[in-house]
Amino acid sequence: MAVIATMNESKDVMGIAVLGACVMFLVQVAHVVTSVIVKRGWCIAGSVFGIAVSLFVSLCSVVALAAGQYRPPVNANGAVEPTELVAGDSVTFSFAGSDVTSDIVAMVPEKNVRRAVSEWLDESLGGTFDGDKEDMGAIVGYYGNMYVDTLNSISSQGVPDYAELSYYARMDKIYETDKVVTYGLTIDIDMGGAHPLSKELGATFSKADGKRLAWDMVSKDGTTGVKNLVKGTLKDYFNVKSDAELMKCLQGVKNANSIPLPKTPPYMTEEGFVIIYQQYEISAYAAGMPGDTIPYKTMKPYLIDEVLKLTEK
């Protein structure tokens, strides 16, 4: 799979570049000394020129790498140029500074769903990108830089020495049929708090029109049935039998019959629909991200006809 790299800045890489230039410099100095000994003037002139080139390369390496952040290419009018991408490629942003790291990787979708998937990626990463929603390179570069700036701001305020300020996001295709495609998105954030935060997201898109599946996939008469399925899924996750035991595992829920559906809509995989709650959404951080996969045959009685057709293989 091709990888389109945006920018990778790291002190290790910078050190290697400078070290290489220094080695070039020392080689040229040695050449000058040797030339003086054997009295070859043309060699001296050439080596002096080589020294100048070495110093110039070293300076350029430091300046270029110190710049650090990816900025999408712009045209003469200052507008961002669209990035030429091929479905299946990965767009990568990578920044590694002394206190901050930011890495975002996103697989480029097929053209027929690219805009819909890109809009979902934008929403999931922050929802503030106002450029071309089909330009995955611009989206990834924008959020990569945004989180570098955010983490640098936090770092400047002072954080414990053990804190590792970082942002990581990766989007991949995880399921596909002739009717739908599902993308999964993993996000890990460490802003120097008591513990890092994570998200496990997914979204299924119709190949026919790019429509993203949402909770409206459930029929009006099927809502109660789906809520009961979700409650059963939570009992399995927490390994409890009764409603009373389940309530001890949840937070912000009044009773076991009013458990809210996850904010993240179900998404399709090979085994069925994935139901997942994010950290802190319904339980303590230590509980992780409660959820599981509900088989298609179990969900089908509660789905609208449009979605039922999408589940057929």
Stretches with model-predicted labels:
Residues 7-10, 36-43, 66-69:
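Transmembrane helix-loop junctions in multipass membrane proteins, especially transporters and channels
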Residues 7, 17, 36-37, 48, ...:
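N-terminal regions of proteins, emphasizing targeting and processing segments when present
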Residues 4, 62-313:
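Compositionally biased intrinsically disordered regions enriched in Thr/Gly
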